[in-house]
């Protein structure tokens, strides 16, 4: 009976507690509860990748702001808009830009004429020095990283100025015409047509050769910046669009597509979708580089140390830690290069001494920036340095002349951390015949050269056949018991140069287990060196991969030693080649 009464009491208390809970007022309103439920129901992580699109902002004493249409256009196109605050703090901007996958440079005030070498004209209107500084800083950082860019109105003018072009400061007085470039109608009302160049990226994007646009500007391009082309014109010959594709991922329009896009225009919307798609590819390229180990197998940077160059500073040289970071490059081979000199005993000994000093200079240089980089001797060193957030520097020797007359020097170089030796340079030496200035390109290794190959195999130093004659190449294939490399050579099938490798050589190198590294030297890439670009280099890379296989092809730029071309002028540009591989459908 007692237990039964206790059970009834507990049930009664429970009912009272439930009634009390129901009568207690919920601290959250029904509207807020519904909103929270909506957020929870749609939080499904990892389903889709949304690229982060920076939007340049304007500044006033009370606020930093941007027109809502820019934000809406990015969201409608599948991007995440990020409004970049106006500041001249380089480190803050660097960290912001390094996270972005694409950028929209927006409309706004006139650009100060001093940035394009002109004096203020009487009709110059409002300028914003703070915004000019901010925009130009962000644009440089974005361009250095090969980030896809869309410039709108002022944004187009900004790109032109940043790369060396000039502007009309006031169209009505400096380029009078019947076209009114400052319409009074609403932004969704087109007021004049533009003619689009048929082969342009803009024509490809919009699918149009004539487009009706709005217009809200009194300045315009006067002289076009190098590296760009005008791809659309107004009826009065004012440039309405420019682009730097395929070398740089930049396109600019003088009209305002964001207004049309936010209002539902599907043609203008394509511009933003194009940017977001490019940004998505760029985002994927960065993620791939975060997972893989990327190495440039040949540079001649140590030659510049004596001139005050430093790997820690972003200067004119092509190789530096900041540029490696911008291009997402993990490691660099620094070659101790020695010119071919006389082959007598005294001259050969001087070559050994010079090479030793160059190698030591590499250690000295890296020591100065040990918080940011380190010497790597092995793959494990590279993996460790990447985990530590540091860049890795391997050491090579270019020209076996550095060995002198004594095989013992090879062991000395091994102890100093040398990972490969290029057997020769542009002239024959005691080891082998060169591909360039040679008595006979069919000749190969000398007797001493065969001993060098044997000793390098024994010590675990890679044999580099770049610069070697075909005869030397085939001799090394024959006598080497280990895989060999060509640290900086391109495809002879695409550019018939004595420094490049035939398809037969590429296949033999792959069969040997070795690797051929694409060289970014213009004369090796295009029969017309002045016309060479990173696009040509991408074709060489694609061909070499198809012939030798992807596991047997790499990159050895020859930066700071003759390498470089339009669109490939430093470590920061190397991510372009990854982007091209993605666009060509290569697997991750």
Task: Tell what function each PLM region has.
Residues 17-19:
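Sec/Tat signal peptide C-region and signal peptidase I cleavage site
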Residues 2, 21-152, 160-161, 168, ...:
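N-terminal beta1-alpha1 cap of cysteine-dependent amidohydrolase-like domains
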Residues 247, 328-329, 418-420, 459-461, ...:
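Glycine-enriched alpha-helix->loop->beta-strand junction motifs that scaffold or abut catalytic
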Residues 165, 380-382, 406-410, 433, ...:
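Distinct, well-ordered alpha-helical segments
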Residues 416-470:
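Metal-dependent enolase-superfamily TIM-barrel catalytic cores that perform enediolate-based chemistry
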Residues 5-13:
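Sec-dependent N-terminal signal peptides
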Residues 231, 238-245, 251, 321-322, ...:
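Short, surface-exposed beta-strand/loop micro-motifs that present aromatic residues
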Residues 284-440, 496-506, 510-517, 521-555, ...:
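N-terminal hydrophobic targeting/anchoring segments and the immediately downstream early-domain regions
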């Amino acid at each position: 009976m007692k237990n039964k009464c206790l059970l009834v009491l507990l049930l009664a208390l429970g009912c009272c507690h439930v009634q009390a809970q129901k009568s207690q007022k919920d601290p959250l309103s029904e509207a807020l509860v519904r909103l929270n439920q909506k957020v929870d129901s749609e939080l499904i992580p990892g389903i889709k990748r949304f690229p982060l699109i920076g939007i340049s902002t304007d500044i006033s004493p009370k606020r930093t702001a941007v027109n809502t249409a820019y934000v809406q256009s990015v969201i409608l196109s599948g991007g995440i808009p990020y409004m970049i605050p106006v500041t001249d703090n380089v480190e803050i901007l660097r960290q912001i830009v390094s996270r972005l996958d694409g950028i929209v440079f927006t409309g706004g005030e006139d650009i100060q004429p001093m940035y394009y070498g002109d004096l203020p004209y009487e009709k110059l209107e409002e300028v914003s020095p703070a915004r000019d500084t901010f925009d130009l800083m962000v644009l440089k950082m974005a361009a250095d990283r090969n980030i896809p860019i869309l410039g709108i109105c002022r944004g187009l003018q900004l790109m032109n100025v940043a790369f060396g072009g000039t502007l009309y400061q006031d169209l009505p007085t400096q380029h009078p015409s019947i076209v009114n470039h400052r319409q009074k109608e609403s932004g969704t009302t087109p007021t004049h047509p533009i003619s689009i160049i048929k082969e342009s990226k803009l024509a490809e994007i919009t699918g149009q050769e004539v487009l009706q646009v709005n217009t809200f500007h009194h300045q315009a391009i006067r002289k076009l910046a190098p590296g760009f082309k005008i791809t659309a014109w107004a009826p009065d010959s004012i440039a309405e669009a420019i682009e730097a594709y395929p070398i740089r991922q930049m396109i600019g329009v003088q009209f305002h597509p964001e207004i049309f896009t936010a209002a539902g225009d599907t043609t203008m919307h394509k511009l933003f979708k194009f940017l977001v798609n490019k940004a998505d590819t760029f985002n994927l390229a960065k993620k791939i580089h975060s997972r893989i180990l990327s190495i440039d197998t040949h540079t001649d940077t140590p030659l510049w140390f004596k001139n005050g160059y430093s790997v820690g500073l972003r200067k004119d040289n092509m190789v530096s830690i900041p540029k490696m970071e911008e291009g997402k490059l993990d490691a660099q081979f620094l070659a101790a290069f020695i010119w071919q000199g006389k082959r007598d005993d005294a001259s050969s000994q001087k070559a050994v001494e010079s090479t030793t000093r160059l190698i030591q200079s590499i250690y000295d240089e890296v020591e100065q920036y040990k918080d940011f980089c380190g010497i790597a001797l092995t793959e494990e060193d590279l993996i460790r340095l990447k985990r530590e957030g540091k860049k890795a520097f391997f050491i090579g020797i270019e020209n076996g002349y550095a060995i002198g007359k004594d095989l013992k020097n090879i062991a000395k170089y091994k102890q100093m951390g040398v990972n490969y030796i290029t057997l020769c340079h542009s002239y024959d030496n005691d080891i082998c015949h060169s591909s360039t200035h040679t008595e006979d390109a069919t000749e190969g290794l000398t007797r001493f050269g065969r001993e060098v190959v044997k000793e390098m195999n024994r010590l675990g130093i890679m044999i580099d056949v770049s610069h070697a004659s075909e005869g030397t190449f085939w001799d090394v294939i024959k006598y080497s018991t280990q895989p060999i490399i060509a640290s900086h050579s391109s495809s002879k099938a695409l550019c018939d140069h004595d420094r490049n490798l035939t398809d037969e050589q590429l296949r033999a190198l792959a069969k040997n287990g070795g690797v051929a590294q694409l060289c970014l030297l213009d004369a090796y890439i295009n029969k017309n060196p002045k016309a060479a670009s990173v696009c040509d280099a991408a074709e060489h890379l694609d061909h070499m991969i198809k012939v030798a296989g992807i596991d047997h092809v790499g990159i050895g730029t020859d930066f700071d030693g003759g390498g470089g071309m339009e669109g490939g002028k430093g470590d920061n540009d190397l991510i372009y080649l990854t982007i091209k591989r993605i666009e060509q459908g290569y697997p991750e």
